Amino acid sequence: MCGIVGVVGNTNATDILIQGLEKLEYRGYDSAGIFVLDGADNHLVKAVGRIAELSAKTAGVEGTTGIGHTRWATHGKPTEDNAHPHRSETERFVLVHNGVIENYLEIKEEYLAGHHFKGQTDTEIAVHLIGKFAEEEGLSVLEAFKKALHIIRGSYAFALVDSQDPEVIYVAKNKSPLLIGLGEGYNMVCSDAMAMIRETNQYMEIHDQELVIVKADSVEVQDYDGNRRERASYTAELDLSDIGKGTYPYYMLKEIDEQPTVMRKLIQAYTDEAGQVVVDPDIIKAVQDADRIYILAAGTSYHAGFASKKMLEELTDTPVELGISSEWGYGMPLLSKKPLFIFISQSGETADSRQVLVKANEMGIPSLTVTNVPGSTLSREANYTMLLHAGPEIAVASTKAYTAQIAALAFLAKAVGEANGNAKAQAFDLVHELSIVAQSIESTLSEKETIEVKVRELLETTRNAFYIGRGQDYYVAMEASLKLKEISYIQCEGFAAGELKHGTIALIEEGTPVLALLSDPVLANHTRGNIQEVAARGAKVLTIAEENVAKDTDDIVLTTVHPYLSPISMVVPTQLVAYFATLHRGLDVDKPRNLAKSVTVE
């Protein structure tokens, strides 16, 4: 949610800011703006809508220092007045901010009586506060910023510019992601390494409650009391080809197509030269020491946890419970005596999950993060990390990260099970089975045209739809329904097929689309009974089945894969269903309304 870019040094700041904001579009936003300094001249430009609209307003705007921002409204409507950057009372100071300031109304009442505000955002309160301390109390910019930071409560990433000193950007963070990008003759600030990958692949982390003074030729990290902190840089494993669409019309389609490659990358990452599964021994021991695994996640990652639950339990001999991070952050249930928390997050920045992780660390509960982003907050703050190796996922609707999460957890389950002498784990040839999954996905992807025709007939004009399944297929139905509703805006729900008769079947009427998933030979006939029930009430049914349970009347037939991995192959046609349904409704596949890729506020 939201994005920050900033640059100071020997550069064309306007171009870098616009290009950086374009790279952050995937995070979600409703307005954007930049502030550019060139000596005594400065330019503040804002726009509601896409970055292209902002870019069109920046002709002639030049400078070597600047900050930019994409805003996803939390306080105040999406208007130019509420768009960032924001200025102080005298307009000397300019600030961009990601996060939520919890005590902004208290600050306004206690410190800012008589100040005039152009918008309704908490960010404007913050920059006015900094300006007050610098201009009314005579503090230096650095001391004014520090004093404000000691007062402000909440989650934030700040980038501050003093229009009287174009040689420096001041930044600070707490519970919201922010990085320093290191260039030659210039340095940068960004919410995400992808924003600056065209300029550098060298980055420096900022930890919570740290303040950084960024100049063209230096970066100084301090805590809020002024104590200097040493910080090494790291190299981001990204290149421009990772973040471009290539010949694809949408990132989502590109990322769907990348899933076979992701499966093979995971095999390479978690096997040795002899083809044996290799997972960090410390992670294996952490699972062995636990008497219960608690998976904490949100959205698609939560569904990936459900899809992995049976596999983890059967191969590790450890009970697994699922928790929604946003619920656990405000009250944990009664835990077992030796819990292990596994956090699943594509971005590694999910604020709700981090809230739980902070509490887990305070309680001394060991934790593992499964994420796509090395160096992310959840990765840094958990005891252990497993990476997805899926490459950047730009589309808001997650596809390849979901399948990679299940595959990564399969490697974990296999490694722990083998270490425990679990017979099922020893017999589970994961490398071979995951190779079959990759081939199955490729086969499904070769049938795009057929799937598109069926989807158009079924969903082009509908307002409601249902997915049904049993066992693992029910968990896939949950993810499939989320994918369809979040980008096509079709009201869709995923149900356990056996629950239809307990209430949901009342919603079935003539023409209601019902998509049924069938992969389990033990359960398939029961689901087919439910299909007959909804068909008898007028539903239009589309069936997706694996070959081992398929019938001639099924619409989409998939290669049979190992039951533990069937959610990976079964979900792919449902991703295409969502993609084509959205495409034929004339909607933006990659950027659905009201959604952000990385949810960094609670």
Curated annotation (Swiss-Prot):
Any idea where the SIS domain is? 283-422, 455-592
Q: What class of enzyme is it?
A: transferase
Pfam families, from UniProt?
A: GATase_6, SIS
| Gene Ontology molecular function, alphabetical | carbohydrate derivative binding; glutamine-fructose-6-phosphate transaminase (isomerizing) activity
Q: Which domain of life is it from?
A: Bacteria
Q: How does it assemble?
A: Homodimer.
Instruction: Explain the purpose of this protein.
Output: Catalyzes the first step in hexosamine metabolism, converting fructose-6P into glucosamine-6P using glutamine as a nitrogen source.
The protein's name is Glutamine--fructose-6-phosphate aminotransferase [isomerizing]
- According to its UniProt entry, this protein's organism is Streptococcus pneumoniae serotype 4 (strain ATCC BAA-334 / TIGR4)
Organism lineage reads as: Bacteria, Bacillati, Bacillota, Bacilli, Lactobacillales
Which gene does this sequence derive from? glmS
